[in-house]
């Protein structure tokens, strides 16, 4: 693995390689000698899992009777099938029609260059749906290949599983042969299955801005490309093979451990023939990726609603790809680029059916996932985490119970919550439903060995245990060897009488049926509120819920809706005396860091940077080094509860600016008035405004802005090509906060003032020189202009609001004076000395 690039503004990004473990090579020797060696070699590779007990079932052997003409896939024959079978003492009449929604042969294969003749055939099999005995509440969903039926029947509250009986007697009437029909009974105490479905015929949702902290369905419309080496190797089976690989990759993205409803949808399949000027595919993985990314963009359409549009592209090749130092590379992709048309792409070296995990791994990078051994992932996964996840840096047997690590789930969740997956919200109009059968049914162990090690390779049957690791024959230095790449047998591969592999285990067919039935997930209860992010000044606390009641299984729908909620906390004012704002404290935490700039001799002071920061980046910790004048993103996120800007009451929550009122309550509608009084009516202050035109060379006092002033605005307009006056600010102690000592600040900047107040300055070279801020000022400020020439047609205007004087005791009215005078005269008249002369 190596990182060779970066993508600013999206956390860690770059180009990543996925490597392969070195093959184990063993000479073909008698089994008795080899057993102990294999036990040692495979001990670390075998999955530790307990076999599930089969659920109670009833079953019968049946012979489906076809009542209408043959249905020949791809031949234009009637897409309707009537079938009758006797089971459980009842006659079941199946009225089936071809389901266009799952019609594999509906996919258009696009050939660029000379199309290979062997690839023009249609795929075997038709998907049929219908009813049973005319019951509108019943459901029949079956796959028909001209000689066998495979699928599920739901009739009168019972669930029936129909499949061909291996080694069964053919039907004497020429119809389907012997099948086995199982009636599955729910386990005792098991409640009804939650199965949420979208209404049939419902319109596709339009792309919209993602809700924050919500689980939303994402549809990854994928272009699959195979080069000429793939066509030469796979021949007529290339299309079926690619769909099988992508089906396994899509299944990985459906696993609940990814904690998001992600559907991988193949919308276009392109096969490159000879004579086509396609991407330059060579040994260098990096150069191949760059060439493919540039080439695929020309095939895309810009409109997301266009049926030919795709969100990501993936190239399969038989070319041996090499990284910087070795040729163990199996794939490469950029990180965090899923909605970037120029970089949402990946390349995969075809290595057999396990290439599905390579494809899932590279697409994981496109979703911003890092390798599980990266520094951020080590802390998120914990010390007990294994290396058997999709995003492991080296290909290994992926844990079927948890294919995605906690780190992968966290990174894709944060990525989508921050709006980077906006292009995935539109549902494809005509999606291709990938093969539903397990790949091992179409590719036995020998064929899997051929796909991995070449056409002469065969499965080594003498090497136990079955399913855990695929051992294949080969030659090294003229000697016959058995070799493995540590990948398990493909799911569905026969491993014994009435047994097949699943997740690296050999299971009975009864147990295998449990993996065919999707189960939709359901939300669990909300968890308790977490700690507040701040002790004062307005923090944020969270509560979350998980998709665990029940956990989705076998590709069942993941929960949709809000997974995290948050609220304000500790909104009271912080104690007076703190000279720094909350964001200033976060920047100042880097003041003693000497490892950021090796060329700078010592530590430096960091202050927040607001000017020039894009609105979408307000919640990154962007700080400016006062000594150098440069500014950098020191943290991808500020602490939750940090104000988005000095002029806003909105706060940052998980890297996004969320509206809050001036009372520091998220969602509140309270606002500051012009006097900066929360919820006030503006009556507590008055506007002061004026202009200045008496310019003389040097610094000129314009006005003293008093302490407590709010909504300050100063604007100087004139011909910027002949400007000769500039704004300046002087503090009470005689020092300058802006443009003092005949030194100008040419670019936009934040003027930091005592009392954690800042004003935004446009820069001396701006077309309209301005100075603005909400205040209130903690101390008086003298506005000056620096005259450096003969000002012509220059206008300087200013305005601000000042608090109204506190009203004193009201003056008595004339009536009050008359009444009080009468009282005094009456008191004097009653005095003993009154009236004496």
From Swiss-Prot:
Highest taxon above the source species: Eukaryota
Protein name in the entry: A disintegrin and metalloproteinase with thrombospondin motifs 4
UniProt-annotated stretches for the region Spacer: 686-837
Tissue expression: Expressed in brain, lung and heart. Expressed at very low level in placenta and skeletal muscles. Isoform 2: Detected in osteoarthritic synovium.
Residues of this chain annotated as glycosylated in UniProt: 68
CC cofactor note: Binds 1 zinc ion per subunit.
Annotated keywords: Cleavage on pair of basic residues, Disulfide bond, Extracellular matrix, Glycoprotein, Hydrolase, Metal-binding, Metalloprotease, Protease, Secreted, Signal, Zinc, Zymogen
Function: Cleaves aggrecan, a cartilage proteoglycan, at the '392-Glu-|-Ala-393' site and may be involved in its turnover. Also cleaves COMP. May play an important role in the destruction of aggrecan in arthritic diseases. Could be a critical factor in the exacerbation of neurodegeneration in Alzheimer disease.
GO BP terms: defense response to bacterium; extracellular matrix disassembly; extracellular matrix organization; proteoglycan catabolic process; proteolysis; skeletal system development
Signal peptide from the UniProt entry: 1-51
Motif Cysteine switch: chain residues: 192-199
PTM statement from Swiss-Prot or TrEMBL: The precursor is cleaved by a furin endopeptidase.
Zinc as UniProt keyword: yes
CDD domains assigned: ZnMc_ADAMTS_like
Domain notes: The spacer domain and the TSP type-1 domains are important for a tight interaction with the extracellular matrix. The spacer domain is also required for cleavage of COMP. The conserved cysteine present in the cysteine-switch motif binds the catalytic zinc ion, thus inhibiting the enzyme. The dissociation of the cysteine from the zinc ion upon the activation-peptide release activates the enzyme.
EC number of this enzyme: 3.4.24.82
Sequence positions that bind Zn(2+): 194, 361, 365, 371
PROSITE patterns, per database record: ADAM_MEPRO, TSP1, ZINC_PROTEASE
Subunit structure as annotated in this protein's UniProt entry: Interacts with SRPX2.
InterPro entries, per database record: ADAM_Cys-rich, ADAMTS/ADAMTS-like, ADAMTS_ADAMTS-like, ADAMTS_CR_2, ADAMTS_CR_3, ADAMTS_spacer1, MetalloPept_cat_dom_sf, Peptidase_M12B
UniProt-annotated location(s): Secreted, Extracellular space, Extracellular matrix
GO molecular function: metalloendopeptidase activity; metallopeptidase activity; peptidase activity; protease binding; zinc ion binding
Domain TSP type-1: 520-575
Residue ranges the record assigns to the propeptide: 52-212
Domain Disintegrin: residue ranges: 437-519
Cofactor(s) for this UniProt protein: Zn(2+)
């Amino acid at each position: 693995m190596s990182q060779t690039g970066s993508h600013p503004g999206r956390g860690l990004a770059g180009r990543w390689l996925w490597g392969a473990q070195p093959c184990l090579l063993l000479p073909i020797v008698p089994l008795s000698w080899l057993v102990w060696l294999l036990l040692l070699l495979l001990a670390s590779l075998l999955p530790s899992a307990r076999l599930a007990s089969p659920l109670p079932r009833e079953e019968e052997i049946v012979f489906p009777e076809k009542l209408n003409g043959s249905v020949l896939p791809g031949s234009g024959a009637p897409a309707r099938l009537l079938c009758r079978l006797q089971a459980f003492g009842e006659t079941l009449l199946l009225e089936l029609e071809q389901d266009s929604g799952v019609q594999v042969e509906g996919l258009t294969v696009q050939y660029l260059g000379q199309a290979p003749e062997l690839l023009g055939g249609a795929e075997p099999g038709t998907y049929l749906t219908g009813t049973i005995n005319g019951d509108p509440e019943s459901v029949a969903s079956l796959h028909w290949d001209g000689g066998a039926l495979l699928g599920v029947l739901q009739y009168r509250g019972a669930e029936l599983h129909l499949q061909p009986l291996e080694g069964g007697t053919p039907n004497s009437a020429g119809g389907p042969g012997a099948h086995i029909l199982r009636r599955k009974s729910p386990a005792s105490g098991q409640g009804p299955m939650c199965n949420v479905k979208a209404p049939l015929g419902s319109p596709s949702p339009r792309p919209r801005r993602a809700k924050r902290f919500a689980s939303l369905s994402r549809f990854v419309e994928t272009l699959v490309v195979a080069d000429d080496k793939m066509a030469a190797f796979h021949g007529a089976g290339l299309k079926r093979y690619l769909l099988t690989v992508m089906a396994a990759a899509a299944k990985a993205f459906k696993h609940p451990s990814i904690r998001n409803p992600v559907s991988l949808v193949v919308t276009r399949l392109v096969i490159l023939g000879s004579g086509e000027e396609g991407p330059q595919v060579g040994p260098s993985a990096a150069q191949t990726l760059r060439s493919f990314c540039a080439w695929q963009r020309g095939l895309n359409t810009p409109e997301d609603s266009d049926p030919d549009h795709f969100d990501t592209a993936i190239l399969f090749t038989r070319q041996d790809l090499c990284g910087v130092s070795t040729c163990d590379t199996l794939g490469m992709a950029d990180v965090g680029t899923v909605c970037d048309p120029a970089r949402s792409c990946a390349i995969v070296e075809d290595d057999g059916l396990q290439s599905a995990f390579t494809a899932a791994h590279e697409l994981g990078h496109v979703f911003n996932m890092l390798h599980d051994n990266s520094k951020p992932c080590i802390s998120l996964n914990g010390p007990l985490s294994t290396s058997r996840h999709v995003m492991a840096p080296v290909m290994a047997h992926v844990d079927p119970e948890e294919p995605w690590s906690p780190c992968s789930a966290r990174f894709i969740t944060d990525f989508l919550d921050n709006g980077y997956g906006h292009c995935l919200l539109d549902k494809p109009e005509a999606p291709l439903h990938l093969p539903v059968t397990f790949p091992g049914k179409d590719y036995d162990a020998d064929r899997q060995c051929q796909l991995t090690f070449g056409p002469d390779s065969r499965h080594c049957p003498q090497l136990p245990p079955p399913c855990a690791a695929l051992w294949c024959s080969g030659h090294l230095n003229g000697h016959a060897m058995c070799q493995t790449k540590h990948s398990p047998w493909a799911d569905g591969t026969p491993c014994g009488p009435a047994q097949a592999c699943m997740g690296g285990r050999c299971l009975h067919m009864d147990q295998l049926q449990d993996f065919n039935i999707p189960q939709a997930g359901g939300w669990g209860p909300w968890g308790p509120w977490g700690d507040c992010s701040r002790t004062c000044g307005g923090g944020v606390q969270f509560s979350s819920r998980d998709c665990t009641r029940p956990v989705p299984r076998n590709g069942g729908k993941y929960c949709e809706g809000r997974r995290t909620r948050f609220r304000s906390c500790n909104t009271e004012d912080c104690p007076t005396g703190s000279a720094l704002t909350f964001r200033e404290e976060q920047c100042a935490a880097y003041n003693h860091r000497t490892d950021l700039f090796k060329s700078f001799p010592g530590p430096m002071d960091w202050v927040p940077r607001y000017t020039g920061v894009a609105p979408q980046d307000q919640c990154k910790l962007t700080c400016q080094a006062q000594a150098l004048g440069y500014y950098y993103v020191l943290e991808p996120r500020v602490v939750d509860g940090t104000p988005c800007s000095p002029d806003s009451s909105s706060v940052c929550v998980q890297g996004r600016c969320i509206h809050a009122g001036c009372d520091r309550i998220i969602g509140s509608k309270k606002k500051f008035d012009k006097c900066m009084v929360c919820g006030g009516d503006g009556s507590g202050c008055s506007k002061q405004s004026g202009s200045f035109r008496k310019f003389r060379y040097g610094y000129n006092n314009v006005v003293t802005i008093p302490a407590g002033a709010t909504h300050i605005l100063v604007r100087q307009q004139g011909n910027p090509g002949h400007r000769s006056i500039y704004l300046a600010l002087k503090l009470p102690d005689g020092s300058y906060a802006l443009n003092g000592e005949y030194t100008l600040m040419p670019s936009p900047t934040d003027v930091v003032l005592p009392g954690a107040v800042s004003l935004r300055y446009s820069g001396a070279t701006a077309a309209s020189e301005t100075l603005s801020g909400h205040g209130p000022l903690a101390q008086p400020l003298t506005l000056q202009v620096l005259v450096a020439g003969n000002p012509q047609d220059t206008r300087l205007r200013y305005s601000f609001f000042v608090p109204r004087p506190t009203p004193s005791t009201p003056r008595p009215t004339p009536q009050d004076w008359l009444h009080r005078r009468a009282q005094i005269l009456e008191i004097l008249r009653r005095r003993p000395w009154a009236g004496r002369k």
